[in-house]
Amino acid sequence: MLNKIQQRNSDIYSMTPFNFFEDFRRNLFNDLKSNLIKTDIHETDNEYVVEAELPGIPKEDIQVNYENGVLTISGQRQIDAAIEDEKGKLIHSERSLTSVRRQYLLENVKEDEIKASYSDGILKVTLPKDSNKEIKTSIPIE
């Protein structure tokens, strides 16, 4: 069974410059996707519920802010690469730093009633809707 390098070297098309750009594009977008917070947003008549995956990030390192109709979720996890523990000295790590941030436009919210909880790597933010705020759906053209 050929490994990835052997397959690439045996492929005649691997010598083209376009393959370099394809690999670059694939790696770039895979890296970007890995730092994107995966989210489900539910809407009812009374509230929005945002459930965001933040696995491995301690609760203390997660920030939730709401300002001007925008919910911002961010978090950071850092692993010290110089640690030596019962498993031995760490000689290779791909998990040294993770920093994520995402924003969501959720307007007409009762800002003082927003609640957040974190369990098993899932952040849940409940944003009650403010029914007193007027929502304008159409603007007349003069």
From Swiss-Prot:
GO cellular component: cytoplasm
InterPro entries registered for this protein in UniProt: A-crystallin/Hsp20_dom, HSP20-like_chaperone, Small_HSP
Domain sHSP: 27-142
Protein name: Heat shock protein HSP.16.4
Keyword Protein biosynthesis: no
Organism in which the protein naturally occurs: Streptococcus thermophilus
Record's subcellular location: Cytoplasm
Record keyword Signal present: no
Family: Belongs to the small heat shock protein (HSP20) family.
Pfam families (alphabetical): HSP20 (PF00011)
Keywords: Cytoplasm, Plasmid, Stress response
The organism's place on the tree of life at top rank: Bacteria
PROSITE patterns given in the database record: SHSP (PS01031)
